Every structure is written in structure tokens, then in C-alpha cells.
């Protein structure tokens, strides 16, 4: 794998540090008036998603991580693993609950997802930015009941709970932003 100098760190670069893959989120090169230049780098730990800030000397380097993002189609969940398929080679890949995490509530059959692989194993699953789901349970919206915040909780077909406007009813299909978990619009 390639070795990168701290001067080469850019957003999106994936490096190995302490035996784990990290993604560079931002890098600021600092050249003080006195002393050695350094890079102040914000990193995201790919295995857990936690953020770390680290300072690298200008002479430091890091090995590139063998991390690949693949567009795969979600097939099904067998109770233990979530199964995905590569549309070009038709190979199937199984991701465990640790890799899928909270994104399980946004996975629909045949949805195109981005699966991040490290050493051939899935470490994270990113669902599509927007999904269309049916409302299976919500309180009825009463006419003129706008004294509150103007929203009510609704349970969707995947089990996710989203705050929706008062006019939305059971059985309607809504569009949800998976990054924030917020209601976007009704689907006609």
C-alpha cells in the first residue's frame, strides 16, 4: 500500500493508524514562525465512526488503508446478517449488525447502498440518501389541532419512528432523509 506524507493529507484520504483504518476529514498545514511545520488533521475512525483530532509533524507519514467503497444492492436480512449483491459480478456479501448499525431501519429490498470494505470485510453500510416508506402507525391528525409544535411521531414499515406533519395519515408513503432521519415530503 502507498505511504502518504502528512503534507499530502486531503479530505477523503483513508490511512492506517494504530492498526485501524481512518478517513481524513480535514487537514490544515501550519507553519509557525518558530519551530517545525505540522499538520493539524481531523480523522474519522472507520470501524466506530468516532472523530479524532491529531497533529502530525511535517516529516511524519502514514500508510494508505486498503479500504474500498462499493455500490451494492441490499437483498435481505436473515436475522443475523444483512445480505448485499454486487450488480456486476453477482457476488453476495454478508454484513453483520456492527457494520450495519442504526442504518438497518433505512434498508429496503433492492436499495442501492454504499458498503465500505476493509480487507474484504464490510465495516460500514450507508443507505441511499432518501427512502420512501409507508406509515404503519400514527395518531390521527385532528382538524384545528395546531397548538403544539405541528408534528407527531409516525412508525414506518421498517420500524423507524419519524416526526411527521399533522396532515399525514396511516397508509401514506412518505420520503425520509436517511442522514438526518427527518420527514421530507409525501409521495404521490
From Swiss-Prot:
Protein name: Elongation factor P
Gene Ontology terms describing biological process: peptide biosynthetic process
Sequence positions bearing N6-(3,6-diaminohexanoyl)-5-hydroxylysine: 34
Record's comment on post-translational modification: May be beta-lysylated on the epsilon-amino group of Lys-34 by the combined action of EpmA and EpmB, and then hydroxylated on the C5 position of the same residue by EpmC (if this protein is present). Lysylation is critical for the stimulatory effect of EF-P on peptide-bond formation. The lysylation moiety may extend toward the peptidyltransferase center and stabilize the terminal 3-CCA end of the tRNA. Hydroxylation of the C5 position on Lys-34 may allow additional potential stabilizing hydrogen-bond interactions with the P-tRNA.
Organism, as annotated: Cronobacter sakazakii (strain ATCC BAA-894) (Enterobacter sakazakii)
Keywords assigned by UniProt, alphabetized: Cytoplasm, Elongation factor, Hydroxylation, Protein biosynthesis
Keyword presence, Transport: no
Cellular compartment(s): Cytoplasm
Amino acid at each position: 500500500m502507498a505511504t502518504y506524507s502528512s503534507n499530502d493529507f486531503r479530505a477523503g484520504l483513508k490511512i492506517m493508524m494504530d492498526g485501524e483504518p481512518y478517513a481524513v476529514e480535514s487537514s490544515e498545514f501550519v507553519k509557525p514562525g518558530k519551530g517545525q511545520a505540522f499538520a493539524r488533521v481531523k480523522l474519522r475512525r472507520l470501524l466506530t465512526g468516532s472523530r479524532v483530532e491529531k497533529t502530525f509533524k511535517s516529516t511524519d507519514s502514514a500508510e494508505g488503508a486498503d479500504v474500498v467503497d462499493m455500490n451494492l444492492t441490499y437483498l435481505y436480512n436473515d436475522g443475523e446478517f444483512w445480505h448485499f449483491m454486487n450488480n456486476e459480478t453477482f457476488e453476495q456479501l454478508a454484513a453483520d449488525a456492527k457494520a450495519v448499525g442504526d442504518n438497518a431501519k433505512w434498508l429496503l429490498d433492492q436499495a442501492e447502498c454504499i458498503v465500505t470494505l476493509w480487507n474484504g470485510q464490510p465495516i460500514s453500510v450507508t443507505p441511499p440518501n432518501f427512502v420512501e416508506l409507508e406509515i404503519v402507525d400514527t395518531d390521527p391528525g385532528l382538524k384545528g389541532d395546531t397548538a403544539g409544535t405541528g408534528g407527531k411521531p409516525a412508525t414506518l414499515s421498517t420500524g423507524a419512528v419519524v416526526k411527521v406533519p399533522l396532515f399525514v395519515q396511516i397508509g401514506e408513503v412518505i420520503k425520509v432523509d436517511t442522514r438526518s432521519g427527518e420527514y421530507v415530503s409525501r409521495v404521490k
